[in-house]
Amino acid sequence: MKTQAKVVVIGGGVVGASVLYHLTKLGCRDVIMLERSELTSGSTWHAAGGMHTINGDPNVAKLQQYTIKLYKEIEDLSGQDITMHMTGGVMLAATEERFDWLKGVYAKGKYLGMDDLEIITPERAHELLPLIDPDQFVGAMYDPIEGHVDPYGVTHAYAKSARKNGAEYYTHTKVESLSQETDGTWNVETNKGTIKAEHIVNAAGLWAREVGRMVGLELPVLAMEHMYLLTEDMPEVAEANAKTGSEVIHAVDFDGEIYVRQERGGMLMGTYEKACVPWSERETPWEFGHQLLEPDIDRIAPSLEVGFRHFPAFERAGIKQIINGPFTFAPDGNPLVGPVKGMTNYWSACAVMAGFSQGGGVGLALANWIVNGDPGFDVWAMDISRFGDYTNMAYTNARVRENYSRRFSIRYPNEELEAGRPLLTTSIYDRQKAAGAQFGASYGLEVPLWYAPEGVKDEFSWRRSTDFDHIGIEAKAVRDSVGLGDISGFAKYSVSGAGAHAWLDRMLACNVPAVGRMTLAPMLKDDGKIIGDFTLASLSDDDFLIIGSGIAESYHMRWFLSHLPNDGSVTVTSHNLELVGLTLAGPKARDVLQACTFDDVSHAAMPFMAVRRMDIGMVPAIVGRVSYTGDLGYEIWVKPEYLSNLFDQFMLAGADHEIRLFGARALNALRLEKNFGSWGREYRPIYGAVETGLDRFVAYDKDADFIGKAGAIAERESGGKLRLCSFVVDAKDADVIGDEPISNAGKVVGWVTSGGFAHASGVSMAQGYVPKELADKSDGWQIELLNEQLDARLQREPLFDANAGRMRS
């Protein structure tokens, strides 16, 4: 066994083998994979092996497309048969609500290049899949790029291909401990000796928690029991094979919470049952391997009952075997991929429950990241940094149970899931709740979404719902008088030290503002793409406050920490809920603030983008003259023990102005009519500054060689490929939410990033990306919503305060 390697991959399942192979594709030869038993031990060997391209996140869908296209390559290179069955598949809808969801998936596929997707009738679905009862369904979607593979064959094809490219892998080699030297290298202690490595990849599957704990890391991963049954040979299968000349196609029956495919002369039926059960909640036994769990048919009986009704032939079939095996899940069901914050060269490739759809993409992204410093794709939906320190074992358990039980359930755009909540709250939570706040969870924190009158609550729908009118009241209150919003969920970072100014000048693409001033601050990757957008406030020569997206706190903190100088001249602190805040916004915002402080907050004394410390009554605060509403407004930041007092002061001082609380949904409506983008929607690491419109905040000519400068200049010279545009949409009873296709002259040319109803302006709006050549085209635009083409109008100027006069007043 080798005693030194550039990368050691821990875990010999499909994901670890894919990572190993992709490292060799990038020229790495000094790489090793370690497996405690045999390849595929754990979850891989008993998987159903299904593969499909459809995913709720379009960027993950692209990686799934890549995975499926990769199979021929590794089969040819390795000589290992992977037994691919490209049968095609149907997604079945038994209700109109589910059919609406399928129409959205179909629309998303159009801009992803999935041109072969079809929305079909139940009768057509029956022609493709004779085993269904078409009377049980209202519609379906057909995808020809769907099927299944042999888990053993795929894993060995990856491993053999990697070995042909120069890698090594060792079975029956158990990792017993990990330790890191001061120079950053790792000691990998195994039952066969020690290996020195530059990088560690945790692809340990069922043992991901154990490998994490070796370095003091508690990964948010939980294994769930998952069952599928295999039938005896069925005459209906033989008849369907003869009739169609091919295997029975795959099917997902969402309302039955089941999936089916052919297995030899019979069928396989798997369930995601409501009465789900975790497996080995605290730790995974090291001796577990090629073993199965005791099946519990009573637990899946409700799903089977629906399945037998929807697929009548199953009721007549004999059950040959019930497979019950554990699979790992993260709290939201997506993988945990990427570098771990605060650790040097420790990488995660865990919780990949759809390994035969996603394994290739995960391996590609992680190999790119290790070798090139960037995944090469937008992998936010899989990035381990999307979770914070709040994801302990109890939280993970609650969320994974919920996610598993809802895997085939509809998630409506206005639906907030309940598991693991409430967890983090501010001191004004009870006040907000008493005022009718309907909460959502953002990065673990309870955030008011909207305020409901007594007796009114969210009714989940693809269309405008019970919140619509009340969000409008909140938004109009901001525009007409004054509103008070909770911004405690924003991310807050302090940057201090003798080297803080110079460090920020390199980290951020903007000019560092003078003391007492703020600026909008794009942050770029090495290639010039956007990796963050912030507000930067200069409190003194060596003390700065950065405000950013709350959901990206770990993501951005990881970037900050990885770029800190080693001399101790810069300190970066993430405040989380140690600094909380409120925003006052609207034409009367200044009057309310002035009534609460002896400081002069007039326009002359505190103009737009000014910032300073001041006392608000008895509360010491940092106040910035800025608002995401695009109106006259302020952001007020305080220590958490002062938040209740601050809230009460503003509500009392604002009573004469009919101050109204507003939530995140009203804030979204207000920012849309200002053409403001947001992180995770309009601003993601696949877009450049020119494409996003953030180039106006990039100081291309400043002396500092900021990260991404060369790439940003190159994009400015070329013009990039895309443009972020705003549209007014001729919508009737529903509004876009994101990922709908944008067409011009009847051809799909772009995609929606976000949207909603701009209540104060009285129109439905969308933001999205289109080719730069079309960005000035005024007519011919349409956006697809619920399988209907809606006319849209390019909205170049903001609908509200186009010249920013009120925002700056």
Predicted regions and their residues:
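Flavin-dependent oxidoreductases
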Residues: 18, 177-293, 302-310, 392-416, ...
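Central beta-strand plus flanking loop segment that forms part of the substrate or channel wall
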Residues: 48-53, 89-91, 217-242, 302, ...
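Flavin (FAD/FMN) cofactor-binding and adjacent substrate-gating region
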Residues: 73, 94-165, 170-171, 176-184, ...
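Glycine/proline-enriched, intrinsically flexible loops and inter-domain linkers
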Residues: 377-378, 382-809
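Dinucleotide-binding Rossmann-like beta1-alpha1 core, especially the glycine-rich loop
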Residues: 49-128, 255-260, 265-268, 401-413, ...
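Beta1/beta-strand and adjacent pyrophosphate-binding region of the FAD-binding site
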Residues: 2-15, 32
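C-terminal catalytic lobe of FAD-dependent flavoproteins
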Residues: 255, 264, 286-424
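Glycine-rich FAD pyrophosphate-binding loop
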Residues: 24-44
